[in-house]
Amino acid sequence: RRAVSLWREDAHRWADTAGAEGAVVERLAVRVRGPLSLLAGLWLPGGERVLGDHGARRDVAESYLEGLQDALPRLRRATGAGRLGVVVDEPWAAAVLAGTLPTASGYRTVRSLPREEARGLWRAALDGLTALPDVARVWLAPGRRAASPGAELPGPAALATLTGESLPRPDAAADAPVPAPVSLVVGVGALDDGADGTPGTREAWEAAAGWADIGRGLTLAPEPGVRPVDVVRTWERLGVDPGRVG
């Protein structure tokens, strides 16, 4: 209840400030924690992570979707935004899938979440969000935050591929690719001529290029220090139209 109260206070303060400034909000982007990372960050009364309990995972996932479907329309009304864009942020996605998150004792790790269950959680969240008339676009942003130094996580390309399998497929009957309401966010590093960059960089670029080639929604997220011009040059070198990426 306290969290809901604070959230509503923030929304009203934002609306009051925009009203005082005479600002007209045509588009508003909202970042929400994704279902996998939410499960990783919640704890049961006994002290263990919700992630390790199948029944608790199911209950939280249902409440999560209900909460978003209630909160987002409220936010749009409070702010007067013409359209909402929602970023589903999954910083712990790779750690959840790799089973590297520690238990409460710290001596063991929570078992990895089955891939099919992860895909199901993402599909349910994305389907619920895109069904809302208040939401114009959704981005799914999987991350590779490690719970401990040296933890082995799925590579950027593998994570992008797994996440992408959860996204809605474009209409195969369409004459031309139409921007999907859901886009996959792929992190990319520097890729100079004749060099592969950091480990996994080339694979991430190739996964992104393949995604764009089949007309799927895609947004590139350059790593710190990577200039936008480098992203465009690499994209062109891979033979993909820069207009296909956000």
Which residues make up each language-model segment?
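Short glycine-centered, acidic/aromatic-flanked micro-motifs in structured strand/loop junctions
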Residues: V32, V88-E90, P222
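Active-site-proximal, glycine-rich beta->alpha crossover segments in alpha/beta enzymes
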Residues: R1-D70, R74, L97-L113, E117
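Active-site loop segments of alpha/beta catalytic cores
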Residues: S63, G67-E203
